[in-house]
């Protein structure tokens, strides 16, 4: 480390230590480390634990080894409130045990992609980090039900838990978790493919504060599970059911009758959902802001009519691969309150019946920011150009296949490659 010969710089004389610490608190990690090399006085100030309450090592993930985490934990101690180790694949259980012992006031911990960690890390967190509120274990594939039992015993203040792609988790783990962590507000279970309806029943019984639930690709879930959730979690605002291919309109009915605060619904690839279900949903869930209905192949313009009438706050809508949607449905959407005032994103990829007429209707959507039109075969470059003349700020994503080369001139058919000619 390179220090100056004197610590008697003017700034150190004029400003009290408390003010210098306050200034340093606004600096990022890299800048703090640079300041630490200026002088001995600044080294002490820059590495003061109070400046290291929030640490994000994502930009250095390939270089972060366990000893780095251990050193940070010793430096920060009880000051550290938030740490992100997202993508730090070199960090394992031993380092995180040291971290947990030293940083007992941690509230927000991101271990997304830390594939070396196992249940041992969760035991350490349970034992030492009782103030933990936010924990991300995405893709920590060695985590099992034992981790959830430990967390439920020692981290009862937990409000957010991401277990996406932790595919060893089963209903037994979820039951243990929710019995202890009854204040959960967000639970993300994407790709937890072993979960069944019974897991959702446990959530219904214990997580009445839940506002966000992600069940993407939990392919064993049926209407029974969704109905249970809706009956117990009336505060639900965001629900992802994408890839839950067993679901029918019964799930939408339960949502409509029990979850009036719903703002986000993702139901991509739920191919059994129909206009009837979305009609009941729209008539009861007036707070809807974002909907992903990609590959809901049975819905028609009727769904868009109901959304136009009853969902004035709608901002983002995906209808990709909904091949029964026509210009008529887009007309209703664009003429509605949400079309005029709120709509920002509309995805219409592979809507084969949509034509340039829809683009004319969408000129009414003055707030539109992004429009997806891949493989809309009846939409033309000219139509897009006319719309962008009216909405110059909108980003239009489309693809037009290269022009097919003209047929060969008469008499030149059945041409052979040079090798064949030689042979």
Swiss-Prot record:
GO terms for biological process: modulation by host of viral RNA genome replication; negative regulation of NLRP3 inflammasome complex assembly; protein monoubiquitination; protein ubiquitination; regulation of autophagy; regulation of inflammatory response; regulation of phosphatidylinositol 3-kinase/protein kinase B signal transduction; SCF-dependent proteasomal ubiquitin-dependent protein catabolic process. InterPro entries: F-box_dom (IPR001810), F-box_LRR-repeat (IPR050648), Leu-rich_rpt (IPR001611), Leu-rich_rpt_Cys-con_subtyp (IPR006553), LRR_dom_sf (IPR032675). It comes from the Eukaryota. Changing residue 404 to A: Abolished phosphorylation by GSK3B, preventing ubiquitination by the SCF(FBXO3) complex. It is a lipid-anchor. The modification Phosphothreonine is found at residue 404. Pathway: Protein modification; protein ubiquitination. Gene3D superfamilies: Ribonuclease Inhibitor (3.80.10.10). Phosphorylated by GSK-beta (GSK3B), promoting recognition by FBXO3, leading to its ubiquitination by the SCF(FBXO3) complex. May play a role in P. Aeruginosa-induced surfactant deficiency by inhibiting PCYT1A in a calcium-dependent manner. The CAAX motif is a signal for the geranylgeranylation of FBXL2 and is required for its association with cell membranes and the recruitment of substrates to the active SCF(FBXL2) complex. This is F-box/LRR-repeat protein 2. The gene is Fbxl2.
């Amino acid at each position: 480390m390179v220090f100056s010969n004197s610590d008697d710089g003017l700034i150190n004389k004029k400003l009290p230590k408390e003010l210098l610490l306050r200034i340093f608190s606004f600096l990022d990690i890299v800048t703090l480390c640079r300041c630490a090399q200026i002088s001995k006085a600044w080294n002490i100030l820059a590495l003061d634990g109070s400046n290291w309450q929030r640490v994000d090592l994502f930009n250095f993930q390939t270089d972060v080894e366990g000893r780095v985490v251990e050193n940070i934990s010793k430096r920060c101690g009880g000051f550290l409130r938030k740490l992100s180790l997202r993508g730090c694949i070199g960090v394992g259980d031993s380092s995180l045990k040291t971290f947990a012992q030293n940083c007992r006031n941690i509230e927000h911990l991101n271990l997304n992609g830390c594939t070396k960690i196992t249940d041992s890390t969760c035991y350490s967190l349970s034992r030492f980090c009782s103030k933990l509120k936010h924990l991300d274990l995405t893709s920590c594939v060695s985590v099992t039900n034992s981790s959830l039992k430990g967390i439920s015993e020692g981290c009862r203040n937990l409000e957010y838990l991401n277990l996406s792609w932790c595919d060893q988790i089963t209903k037994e783990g979820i039951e243990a978790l929710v019995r202890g962590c009854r204040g959960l507000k967000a639970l993300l279970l994407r790709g937890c493919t072993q979960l069944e309806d019974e897991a959702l029943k446990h959530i219904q019984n214990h997580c009445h504060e839940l506002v966000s639930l992600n069940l993407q690709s939990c392919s064993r879930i049926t209407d029974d599970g969704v109905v249970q959730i809706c009956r117990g979690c009336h505060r639900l605002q965001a629900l992802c059911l994408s890839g839950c291919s067993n679901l029918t309109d019964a799930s939408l009915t339960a949502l409509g009758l029990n979850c009036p605060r719903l703002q986000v619904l993702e139901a991509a690839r739920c191919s059994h959902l129909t206009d009837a279900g979305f009609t009941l949903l729209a008539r009861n869930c007036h707070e809807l802001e974002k909907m992903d209905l990609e590959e809901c192949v049975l819905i028609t313009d009727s769904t868009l009519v109901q959304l136009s009438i009853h969902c004035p706050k709608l901002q983002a809508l995906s209808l990709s691969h909904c091949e029964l949607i026509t210009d008529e449905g887009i007309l209703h959407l664009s003429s509605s309150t949400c079309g005029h005032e709120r709509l920002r994103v509309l995805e219409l990829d592979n809507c084969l019946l949509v034509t340039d007429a829809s683009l004319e209707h969408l000129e009414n959507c003055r707030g539109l920011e992004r429009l997806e039109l891949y493989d809309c075969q009846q939409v033309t470059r000219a139509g897009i150009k006319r719309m962008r003349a009216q909405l110059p700020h909108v980003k239009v994503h489309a693809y037009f296949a290269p022009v097919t080369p003209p047929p060969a001139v008469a008499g030149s058919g059945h041409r052979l490659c040079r090798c064949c000619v030689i042979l």
